[in-house]
Amino acid sequence: MTERQLIDDFLAQKRIAVIGVSRNSRDFTRAMYNEFIRRGYDAVPVNPNAAEIDGRESFARAGLIDPKVEAALIMTPATQSEAIARECAEAGIQRVWFYRATGRGAVDERAVDFCESRGMQVVAGRCPFMFFPGPGFHGMHAFLVKLIGRYPR
């Protein structure tokens, strides 16, 4: 699959774990989590230090989520990504997105290689906000990325 097909397939799933969503309501991870909910996704928070996020049960690890999710957005530091990728594989999660806007984000090459070696679908980098339809700052960002030829096809 092309990168764009992987992104579209990920976003076509309805039940998605958001791994690394913060307890801090002002954190960017919460904005991302809330946007998935606003768009009708069943977003499942994963944070080992939170029993709930915005009234929804939070799980300590991907493998504890019940019922299972179809995909996982990983928004943790890259140093945690390989262990989280292994948890996702053990939990039967076949689609993972390692978030990155600037810097390294959650992208770790060992984690990406692990997932790909297991036949999992991987989006390594990028921000889901750029691929949600509609106006806004991230729509403008997506437009600019298209202009410079770096938008996935």
What is each residue range found by the language model?
Residues 49, 54-77:
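Mobile, glycine- and charge-enriched loop segments
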Residues 131-153:
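A charged, well-structured terminal subsegment
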Residues 22-26, 30-54:
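NAD(P)-binding Rossmann-fold cofactor-contacting core
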Residues 69-105, 109:
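Mid-chain, well-packed structural core segment of small domains
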Residues 41, 91-96, 118-120:
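A short helix->loop->beta-strand "cap" motif at the edges of active sites that frequently abuts
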Residues 1-12:
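Short N-terminal or domain-adjacent regulatory/targeting segments
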Residues 17-19:
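Conserved beta-strand elements of the Class I
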Residues 101-129:
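Rossmann-fold NAD(P)-binding glycine/threonine-rich loop
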